[in-house]
Structure formats: C-alpha cells, structure tokens
Amino acid sequence: MPAPQKDGPRANRDIRGVREVQLIDDTGQNRGVVPFFDALNLAEEVGLDLVEIAPNSVPPVCKLLDYGRFRFNEQKKQNEARKRQKTVEVKEIKLRPGIDKHDYDTKMKSVHRFFEEGDKVKVTLRFRGREMAHQDIGLRLLERVKSETAEIAKVESEPMLEGRQMIMILAPR
C-alpha cells in the first residue's frame, strides 16, 4: 500500500527522484542549478527547509524557507479567499394579481434592495380560485416588474406557469 499523499508542496527529504534543483535562497536570490544534496545541506546549515515550489519544471524549483510559516501563510490566504467568497441567494417575492399600488411599491423596494445585496429574485405570482381564468392580468404584472427592473436586473427565466402560480427569476446585472 503506497504512503498517503501529503497536501501541499514537498519539503526536505520528501523531495525524491531529483538529482539537481533550481535553488532560490532565503533572500529571494536565484542560486542557479545546484545538486539536490548540496541544496539540502545548505538548508540545514541556515536552519531553514528546502521546499519544492515548482515540481513540474525541469529541474524543479526549490526555495529555502521556514516550512511551518509557509504552511501557516498558505492556510491564512485560503481562509481569506473563503471569507471573500459570496454565495448568491435566491430571494422570493410573492405577489397576487389584484395587488394594490402601495403594496406593489413596497415589494419593488424589497426587490431593489435584494439586487443591491447581489442576490437573485424569484417573483412568484399566485392565482386563487377564479383568478386562473385571468392569467393575462398576472402576465402583465410580471411584465411590469420586468420593465421596472430592466436597468438593474436581467431576466434569467421568463414568466412561466407552474400549477397555480406564475414564476419569473431575475438576476442582478
């Protein structure tokens, strides 16, 4: 059974099958192509680790540095990148065909706020009872929402009827 792979770059004696390496010292100076064991001895003399930076190049590029600090900084960078990553949520706004002007304006304020936050908006228009006979009213309402948000949003999914509700999905531009 092969040994488990370590995550991250190889260091010191973990670097195998290499006779010579392109060495970069702790000050960032390129020392050129050096025999592997000379580079390893130099790392031990200075009290640092020989870390393989570019394993696929010929010869591999190795650098003298503190491996523990290097791993810590890499982990810190990954955590920062994870924090900056924004998950896009889909917020839902529910409307009815007979919605009043003030209620409509309030819903539209919410829609604008969701777009400012970078979220997608699912506009759901629910029909009840005999309202199903007047789907054109619902379609006009969704077209009105689409035209009012045209500058700040794009339509990801056109209005379509699913059962007793008409759904449209908008995404911020």
UniProtKB/Swiss-Prot annotation:
It is found in: Cytoplasm. Its main location: cytoplasm. One of its GO terms (molecular function) is ribosome binding. Gene3D superfamilies: Translation initiation factor 3 (IF-3), C-terminal domain, Translation initiation factor 3 (IF-3), N-terminal domain. Belongs to the IF-3 family. IF-3 binds to the 30S ribosomal subunit and shifts the equilibrium between 70S ribosomes and their 50S and 30S subunits in favor of the free subunits, thus enhancing the availability of 30S subunits on which protein synthesis initiation begins. This is Translation initiation factor IF-3.
